[in-house]
């Protein structure tokens, strides 16, 4: 494993518990289609706070779970050390998106402002609800409406009117009282 100096890594999953005695591990993918995690290579593992590159040797489905074999991880003991470690990939491997489509990591940290100019807060995370994605917006400490958090559906053009990644601003048609 080599250390990754560059810190442009996005978490795409997590290693789970060991499987068998030959170093296999379960994985939990946070990509839209679970097996899409294998489209993004190379992988980096966050070990003791540092990203280290690792080579994927093999993967397969086993009882509706995905298990992986990593190069150099050849027994249960070596695999146990990696249990629950985050899997990341360099952002440069992600494809360019069409206008109106955004990666969640681009939206997190953006300031949300409604059409009246009221600053509603900052996007802290995204949620997938099945029908649409939702912005989780942490309200400012002195929010005039007493809100701590707002959940705003990411419906482009309906609710989300403009996203400016240069200024990290999202303009929404949303009542500040909600």
Swiss-Prot record:
One of its GO terms (biological process) is maturation of SSU-rRNA. GO terms for cellular component: cytosol; ribosome. Its main location: cytoplasm. Residues 99-178 form the PRC barrel domain. It is found in: Cytoplasm. Keywords: Chaperone, Cytoplasm, Ribosome biogenesis, rRNA processing. The keyword rRNA processing applies. GO terms for molecular function: ribosome binding. Binds ribosomal protein uS19. NCBIfam families: 16S_RimM. An accessory protein needed during the final step in the assembly of 30S ribosomal subunit, possibly for assembly of the head region. Essential for efficient processing of 16S rRNA. May be needed both before and after RbfA during the maturation of 16S rRNA. It has affinity for free ribosomal 30S subunits but not for 70S ribosomes. Belongs to the RimM family. The PRC barrel domain binds ribosomal protein uS19. This is Ribosome maturation factor RimM. It comes from Haemophilus influenzae (strain ATCC 51907 / DSM 11121 / KW20 / Rd).
